[in-house]
Amino acid sequence: MTLAEKALKLHEEWNGKLETVSKTPVKSREDLALAYTPGVAEPCKVIAKDKEAAYKYTMKANTVAVVSDGSAVLGLGNIGPYAAMPVMEGKAVLFKEFGGINAVPICLDTLDTEEIIKAVTYLAPGFGGINLEDISAPRCFEIEERLKATLDIPVFHDDQHGTAIVVLAGIINALKVVGKKKEDCKVVVNGAGSAGVAITKLLLTYGFPYIVMCDKVGIVSKDTEGLNWMQQKMTEVTNPKNETGSLADAMKGADIFVGVSAPGIVTEEMVASMNKDAILFAMANPVPEIMPDLARKAGARVVGTGRSDFPNQVNNVVAFPGIFKGALEGRATQITEEMKLAAANAIASLVPEDELSDNNIMPEAFMPQVADAVAEAVKSHIHN
């Protein structure tokens, strides 16, 4: 049985990966009176006077909404809200299994930015945080920014920031392996969508001075036509030498390549044109921009992908459960750049320096201390 056949069979057997489980026994009239009427009126009255009491008396304190419109799902594209539900259920499972957080999948049947913002705003009182998922660019940028500005709970688009955090964590350790400094590195980020933009922003915040973004059109510069508003904004802080040309041109003399783009678009010749001891993260899924063996053969020293069957898996699951765990426990109202940097450093630190190697730069997702380490790092930077 193939993986695809097994996955389909199991999803049919599961009939959904989630269920509601009661924490409250209802085995007697007294149980019923306490869990529901008339006893339930007492916490209602307290919360009516002070909405913050909802964190004490309801599941809000440890529950997030996983919200999608199904417009940019994995490598499947715009498949809509019904087809997106298995992914959102899966995300909720990861929240619970890796972070101990309750998560509710919500798939919205609209692509309208205003309607999505309204829907999430109306739903927000029941949740301690909002995880936006698989919403296409550039709409995702506006949706997140406006929700962050209006809601008093953390709003986090994991496709952007979770990806950026794990990429930075991997690069921090890879630089130790190859003995380079961030100030001396040229970075090429291929893919100027949600993940590529967020990765670039976080690398800039961390202190990389020389980043060139590329997209289908090649190098993204101030002269590139057809850019969306966010891509245009990124030209103001990237490509300091105003390079032009193709991806191949951008990779010449680069020290770090991060791909969040398309399968098979990086050649061995491109990798060979990079500087010695190059770091290459080919994160297109399921087929990376270049296969790891070919990248190493062409001269790359540290190679990461998004896949679990290769060394150096760069996967969001080591980030988002701990980030939300810390944000919820610390009652953060936002997830800030400081918290993202702290999370990346915490993830990187989970691989002891004496164990770092070309093929070991990322912590294993199943290490029990990952979420707690990230959560503590996030909590230490909460300044509400």
Task: Mark where each language-model region is.
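N-terminal ligand-binding/catalytic initiation module
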Residues: 1-153, 375, 381
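Solvent-exposed alpha-helices and their adjacent loops that cap or buttress functional pockets
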Residues: 12, 55-60, 96-97, 122-124, ...
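Short, ordered loop/turn segments at secondary-structure junctions
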Residues: 69-71, 79, 108-109, 134-137, ...
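Glycine-rich phosphate/diphosphate-binding loop of Rossmann-like nucleotide-binding domains
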Residues: 74, 79-99, 157, 165-262
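General beta-strand structural signal in soluble alpha/beta enzymes
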Residues: 105, 131-134, 155-158, 189, ...
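Adenosine-phosphate binding glycine-rich loop
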Residues: 158, 282-384
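Rossmann-like adenosine-cofactor binding region
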Residues: 232-302, 307-309
